[in-house]
Amino acid sequence: MGSIEIPNCSGSIVYKTISDFIDFPDHEQKLWWHSTAPMFAEMLRVAGYDLHSQYKILGIFLNHVIPFLGVYPTRINNRWLSILTRYGTPFELSLNCSQSLVRYTYEPINSATGTVKDPFNTHSIWDALDRLMPLQKGIDLEFFKHLKQDLTVDDQDSAYLLENNLVGGQIRTQNKLALDLKGGNFVLKTYIYPALKALATGKSIKTLMFDSVYRLCRQNPSLEAPLRALEEYVDSKGPNSTASPRLLSCDLIDPSKSRVKIYILELNVTLEAMEDLWTMGGRLNDASTLAGLEMLRELWDLIKLPPGMREYPEPFLQLGTIPDEQLPLMANYTLHHDQAMPEPQVYFTTFGLNDGRVADGLVTFFERRGWNHMA
């Protein structure tokens, strides 16, 4: 079994209090709790969540999420490798600084994951949803059921992929969940990766994703205009483009309010490529977009991403190794109901860069705008 060291932030009274009363069902869950909860608790405290919300959020995480994280990762154990991190770990915390909102993402894993019963982890997400749905009002699975059926492999697809040895080193993650924590409540989201479905059907990821969302638009026509605008932009880049659709996400709420996001991976890491993603090749030219473009250029200059062509690396990194690689760029485009154009969001992929240099760049960026609470 693995062992852990409690991080310095373990002084959180909430983490310590909950830990005093836990009767863990197995050692794996104990390791997961003590390696993630101290940082989780500290992030909630720093972000200003009240004490009641902190206890509720950590209680949900302990009882309804940790049981779906699988075996605790070590360098020697056999475990499911998730696309969520370059080390294959299935859990990640994040913080929306401008809104002081904590969120976490995980790929649900159960005992059948990676076995002949569920070789590509298609089914465990349903068990995870069964645990979460009674905890939060307003969860709606209409979009999820539609997209999952179209974009993840079924048992017949799985058998075909295995019999023909088609997967190889292909990343096997197909779906994951995210919780945006708003007070003591949460908004549930899903992310879906169609790469295995593309292998099984012979269709491109782009075709699978856009066709599925177009079918979704039959019942939700208010999403069609931004979808068509995005497809026109993607198609305009041509068949040899370094940018291609990779995954999509949606909110698991009332379909009339749910947003769909389509993610584009860009192998060409340059400021010009990021500017093109941000403006959709000049299609977005309103005042807000242009103001954001100037901020993007400033941040690029501060962080100094090394330019070049970057393939998504294989295989996963060994636990404990220091990364010596750079990832491609990524952008997502949010399809809002009744809006003509999608809303862009670009990612500065700083993985593998010096953390201190990146932090210094962000501090400078925040201070220039008077966002001292974020710096």
UniProtKB/Swiss-Prot annotation:
L-tryptophan binds at I83, L84, E92, Y193, R246. One of its GO terms (biological process) is indole alkaloid biosynthetic process. This is Tryptophan dimethylallyltransferase. The keyword Hydrolase does not apply. Tryptophan dimethylallyltransferase; part of the gene cluster that mediates the biosynthesis of fungal ergot alkaloid. DmaW catalyzes the first step of ergot alkaloid biosynthesis by condensing dimethylallyl diphosphate (DMAP) and tryptophan to form 4-dimethylallyl-L-tryptophan. The second step is catalyzed by the methyltransferase easF that methylates 4-dimethylallyl-L-tryptophan in the presence of S-adenosyl-L-methionine, resulting in the formation of 4-dimethylallyl-L-abrine. It comes from the Eukaryota. It comes from Trichophyton verrucosum (strain HKI 0517). Its EC number is 2.5.1.34. Pathway: Alkaloid biosynthesis; ergot alkaloid biosynthesis. GO terms for molecular function: tryptophan dimethylallyltransferase activity. Substrate binds at R103, K189, Y191, R259, K261, Y263, Q345, Y347. InterPro entries: Aro_prenylTrfase, Aro_prenylTrfase_DMATS. It catalyses: L-tryptophan + dimethylallyl diphosphate = 4-(3-methylbut-2-enyl)-L-tryptophan + diphosphate. Belongs to the tryptophan dimethylallyltransferase family. Keywords: Alkaloid metabolism, Transferase. It is an enzyme of class 2 (transferase). Homodimer. NCBIfam families: arom_pren_DMATS. Coiled coil: none annotated.
